[in-house]
Amino acid sequence: TAADGSFTLPGHERERFIFITTPSGYKTFNRHYHKIEEKQSGYDFGLMPYSGRIRKDGSHKYIHIADTEIFNTENHEDWVNNVRDYARNEQAAFIIHTGDICYEKGLKAHIKLMNTENMDCPVFYCIGNHDWVKGKYGEELFESIYGPVYYSFDAGNVHYIVTPMPGGDHAPGYTADDVCRWLKNDLAHIRPGTPVVVFNHDLLTYE
């Protein structure tokens, strides 16, 4: 990485995204990832200062939800609005959903209800076993809506990591080795003593 922020990556044939670890105190202009395009050689990530609901000492709260398993956008506004209002009242820095959004209809509907703009704070998603659906590979639809299935971000004084399960209702397009390779690289850049929290729907491996 150069002083002006430009970077060069050798690439990896199994990767479909380029993504960054959003640093604490900032947010991306649009999103933390870009899909790798065959004819595209440059990718830019715009960051802007963002304190969110993080205290000066770095401490913060977050809301963790899972298994909402919706199939449409009807009759869900009330509970989604309750989560949003609770996040505001508790000054939650972000919301994390750790999977089982649920099947094709749920994957397409959930993002319309619970997203960063609607919830008034960053919203992150993790894939669950019922979020692998029929396609070229199980997470294809999830990736097209929510982005990569493994990534990390910083909030306050904590490093957060999102990892997928080994598989679900349909075969994934990655292996545990792919995720572990990335995870080792991610952790190698963490300052010693930094608290680390890992989110997943179920363990990547039981070994």
Segments from the language model and where they lie:
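Active-site neighborhood of phospho(di)ester-bond hydrolases with catalytic His/Asp-centered motifs
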Residues: H64-A66, F94-D100, P122-N129, T163, ...
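Short, acidic/polar N-cap/turn motifs at the starts of alpha helices
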Residues: N30-Y33, G42, P148-S152
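Active-site-proximal beta-strand elements of phosphoester/diester hydrolases
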Residues: S59-N72, N157-G167, V197-N200
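Long, structured stretches of catalytic cores involved in phosphate-ester chemistry, encompassing
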Residues: T194-V197, L204-E207
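N-terminal active-site segment of His-dependent metallophosphoesterases
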Residues: T22-S24, K35-A109
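Extended active-site neighborhood of metal-dependent phosphoesterases/phosphodiesterases
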Residues: P23-Y26, L107-P195
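A short, solvent-exposed loop/turn motif at the edges and junctions
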Residues: E15-K35
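Short, surface-exposed beta-strand/beta-hairpin micro-motifs centered on an aromatic residue
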Residues: A2-G11
